[in-house]
Amino acid sequence: SAIKRELTMSMLKDQPSNVVALLQQARMNEDVEVVHYATVMLAELHKEYDLKIQELKQELLKQPDDIDILEKLCLALEDYLASGLVAGKFDESSPRQYIDLLRRKVAISHELKDYLRLGGQYLALGEGQRLRQILDYCQVEWPMEEAYRVFQFQALVAQGDRLGLQQFYQDIETRQVYLSRHNRQIIDSWRIQA
């Protein structure tokens, strides 16, 4: 029984988003044992994330400028948010905590991937003005980077910004921005549809 539980928890930690929806659905089952098992597993997942996040927050308090701890905490919160476990009051506060951590990380690391993660959160929360600031900054710092250009494209599509997309197409052609074949095909298919 203990081994079975340990294996199940290991699977849940490896792919929580795939399993959380099933566990939440199982909580509505008519079988009391299934409901109990699903509830216990969800509680265990919450506990695991909470403990990990709290430990990392404590470490960060002791070493506030440690980029590795900050990255681990960002990843833990990112995983927690993606898991589907966040609900209620945490549904609003967790993304804000994540944004605050990403802002801190951007100030220390100045890496494109962190700006894109921050921009992704602004996009998800519908914070267009802040997203625009991120895109403008990346345009100055990394205008030729494929990762930036793909994110810029995704943001423009998500916002339904036709004028922005026209400028995007013109800019990547003028600058001759390298895009992988896969990304080029996706962008070209959208261009044809527009």
Predicted regions and their residues:
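Amphipathic alpha-helical repeat scaffolds of TPR domains
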Residues: 32, 36, 43, 62-85, ...
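Structural detector for internal amphipathic alpha-helices that build alpha-solenoid repeat scaffolds
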Residues: 3-14, 25, 36-44, 117-121, ...
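Long, non-transmembrane cytosolic or organellar matrix-exposed soluble domains/tails
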Residues: 81-194
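Amphipathic alpha-helical scaffolding segments comprising HEAT/armadillo-like alpha-solenoid repeats
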Residues: 16-27, 50-55, 114, 128-134
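TPR repeat positional signature
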Residues: 3-4, 15, 70, 77, ...
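Short inter-helical turns and helix N-cap capping residues of alpha-solenoid HEAT/ARM repeat scaffolds
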Residues: 2, 27-34, 66, 111, ...
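Conserved small-residue packing positions in alpha-helical repeats and bundles
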Residues: 7-8, 23, 43, 57, ...
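Alpha-solenoid HEAT/Armadillo-like helical repeat scaffolds in large eukaryotic proteins
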Residues: 1, 21-31, 59-61, 105, ...
